[in-house]
Amino acid sequence: MDESHIRNFAIIAHIDHGKSTLADRLIEECNGLDEREMKDQVLDSMDIERERGITIKAQTVRLAYKAKDGQTYYLNLMDTPGHVDFSYEVSRSLAACEGSLLIVDSSQGVEAQTLANVYKAIDSNHEIIPVLNKIDLASSDPDKVKLQIEDMIGIDASESLLVSAKSGIGIQDVLEAIVSRLPAPSGKSENPLKAILVDTWYDTYLGIVILLRIKDGVIRKGMKIVMMSNNAVYQVDNVGIFTPHKKVVDQLSVGEIGFITASIKELSDCKVGDTITEEQRRCSEPLPGFRTIHPVVFCSIFPNEAGEFERLREALKKLQLNDASFTFEIEVSNALGYGFRCGFLGMLHLEVIQERLEREFNLDLTATAPGVIYQVTTRSGDVRKVHNPHDFGESQDIANIKEPWICATIMVPDQYLGVIMSLCNNKRGEKLDLSYSGNTALLKYRLPLSEVVFDFYDRIKSMSKGYASLDWEMDEYLDSEIAKLSILINSEPVDALACIIHKSKVEQRGREICLRLKDLIPRQQYKIAIQAAVGGRIVARETISPYRKDVTAKLYGGDVTRRMKLLEKQKKGKKRLRSIGNVNVPHNAFIQALKIID
């Protein structure tokens, strides 16, 4: 294929600005699917994406477009997620493309994630075409949004395209702009094969499928390929493209994006960002690859049935193949048994992974309280990264604790600025900058990550009636007053309920958990003490009263000493029972108690 007739582009935007709808219209215009197969969010293949109305996985499709110059061009479209938790998917898509369509809602204007994604595109040396969507809305104001793009992003918006993805207005102009304004890929077909591994996933029938972008050379069926990170050699079984259906082709050449299968059994051989080359003619050096993304939110996931542990392990492996930013390792809990400590990019990422495990693999799971990574320095001078309360150690052995802080960018209409700033201050935030573009405030705050990952995004949305937007990036580790809150039942610590929180919140959190457990744990024959402790200090306590058996019911008067003797005997029995008996805490009580921690 002549690479001058190929255009690789990503669609980037803030969440809900119409990326997937525009992708639908482009597919429709290029006759990628017939009318019977067309549906909304056609590239969002997971049920969870359709239900939530969001894109989670970046998707690709090749379209054939006959332009006004009479030539047929092949457009490789990559639809990307808009939520901050899935920004890694955006980065990978941009690495496979030469240009981007920047979609901005003409009624909402530039939002925080718009800025974050467009800066990624600029860093990738992309040609950017601004597209103002939803121009058919009464509240649309294209001129104001053009000024906002130039003012806040710093790119020329005078030739922005005006479209309505929903009604199909301006779609032809978008296709012509892609052909005329975006560059063709560079590279030479006669060079040794050099391809970047963009994504991987597991297919029940094909095994591991690899999505790749050819930078140099050609890949075809039967060719022996090498993964340059570990020199693993495989023979290509199939080569294909997405139209958006899978379509097998003879070969992929320079500039093309497609998939291969090669009977790959080892999940560890498929590293996203790896360079793939030919065994006979290896390329001289690998491609730069992608920046390594490290998880920032951690929680433990346990199967509710002990026999499901191996199924959970296999499910996690398959999901990790499809999502390189997700990590897991085995963990053992006294209360919940065998499970895994998992790492995520944010709370939405956590929710999506848990929901996919339950839906796609039919698993019944319990998740513990989410937490972040702390930097703990012991009195002996050792520095450890800790995200599991179990590894936190005793307070008397700790010299210093640092917690991760982030730099948050919040865009908010000025009438909601006051409540948003109050929220940031309540979350221990430090204001860095405040600027305006029209009646929109651009607010920059430094905040502890632990305060942001739980409910911060939801609260910003609710306080601003949905108009505020948030983007954030990791900043640095700073000294902090952090403590491990332990929950004890009859003086025995319950590891599954321990959490790491700021010292200012230990009493409130401890009281909430103790009260919840008091309602959930059934009464026993003896008194049960539920305590929340920091080190050796008890910060909250609740007591569950015992059942009382009336041992004096059979007495008919007589000497009072007989009555006292029976009561004393009962008291000793209960004391002995309390010292040797384990409190039977129902599994459901753990699940309900963990909800309060969330």
Swiss-Prot record:
Record-annotated membrane-spanning stretches: none
Swiss-Prot/TrEMBL catalytic activity: GTP + H2O = GDP + phosphate + H(+)
Topology in membrane: Peripheral membrane protein
EC number(s) per entry: 3.6.5.n1
Main localization category: membrane
Record key words, sorted: Cell inner membrane, Cell membrane, GTP-binding, Hydrolase, Membrane, Nucleotide-binding, Protein biosynthesis
Subcellular location: Cell inner membrane
GO biological process assignments: positive regulation of translation
InterPro entries: EF-4, EFG_II, EFG_III/V, EFG_V-like, EFTu-like_2, G_TR_CS, LepA_C_sf, LepA_CTD
Key word ATP-binding present: no
Highest taxon of the lineage: Bacteria
GO (cellular component) term, any one: plasma membrane
Residues involved in GTP binding: D16, H17, G18, K19, S20, T21, N133, K134, I135, D136
Gene Ontology molecular function terms on file: GTP binding; GTPase activity; guanosine tetraphosphate binding; ribosome binding; translation elongation factor activity
Domain tr-type G: start-end pairs: 4-186
A Pfam family that the UniProt record links to this protein: EFG_C
Cell division is among the record's keywords: no
HAMAP family assigned to the protein according to its UniProt record, in alphabetical order: LepA
Protein family: Belongs to the TRAFAC class translation factor GTPase superfamily. Classic translation factor GTPase family. LepA subfamily.
Role this protein plays: Required for accurate and efficient protein synthesis under certain stress conditions. May act as a fidelity factor of the translation reaction, by catalyzing a one-codon backward translocation of tRNAs on improperly translocated ribosomes. Back-translocation proceeds from a post-translocation (POST) complex to a pre-translocation (PRE) complex, thus giving elongation factor G a second chance to translocate the tRNAs correctly. Binds to ribosomes in a GTP-dependent manner.
Protein's name according to its UniProt entry: Elongation factor 4
